[in-house]
Amino acid sequence: MNTEWKHHPEEWFFLHEFNVDKVFSTIQRADYLILYYIKVEQESRPEQKVYLADLAAAMGLKVTELSKAVEKLQDKGFVVWKTDREAGRTYVELSSKAVELMAEERIFMEHCYQRLRAEIGEEELRRTVATMKKATEILRQERETTG
């Protein structure tokens, strides 16, 4: 099992393996993805703050791109954006609203993920994901070559 699958496999599956926006009912997938990374960073280093630059690096984004997205999350009440004056850096924290909604979504994802594994089987599910990734990569390459 990949490291990514070990921690919150149901969230990882729906965020990275099975990209279906309809799974999410209270939070948009794009928002949930950022919130998920904030949560993972908080859980992996609970004694430290989640600095925007570190989060951007973990997500493979530019700080300016992530900054815009985090601003929208703050407007929706999902994060609190603060400044660490001592470190001279900005950091984010999940709001209680985000924690609550993510918990609801996670329960639903757990249910769906378990049912998929039970009815389709672990191996078939992995093969399906691999096929979907291959198809997506082909489409991406075609998009790049045709402009």
Model-identified regions with their sequence ranges:
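N-terminal leader segment of winged-helix/HTH proteins
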Residues: 1-30, 36, 76
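Short, locally clustered residues in the helix-turn-helix/winged-helix DNA-binding domain
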Residues: 36-43, 106
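Key DNA-contact positions within bacterial/archaeal DNA-binding proteins
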Residues: 32, 64
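Charged, amphipathic alpha-helical coiled-coil/dimerization segments
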Residues: 71-126
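C-terminal regulatory/oligomerization modules of transcriptional regulators
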Residues: 1-6, 123-147
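A short alpha-helical element within helix-turn-helix/winged-helix DNA-binding domains
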Residues: 49-58
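Short, hydrophobic-biased segments on the C-terminal half of alpha helices
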Residues: 52, 70-71
